[in-house]
Amino acid sequence: MEINRRHGGPYDRGSADSYYRRPRRPHFFTEATYASDEIEERFMAKQQIAEYNLGFDDNEASGSFKDWG
């Protein structure tokens, strides 16, 4: 499976949710994050959900989390 790591894409959103310690909630943006349409899990293809989960899991495994001080 080839992973699209573009900003706002499913992999990026999964890794960002993990980084900021947000709950797992598959979604992505059609273009720029927060400046374009958000696609919710119910409208995502199986591969897009898998990419989101991979991004989330990769970040969890790396232990790279926001330090809220």
Residue ranges: model-predicted function:
Residues 1-69:
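Intrinsic-disorder/low-complexity detector
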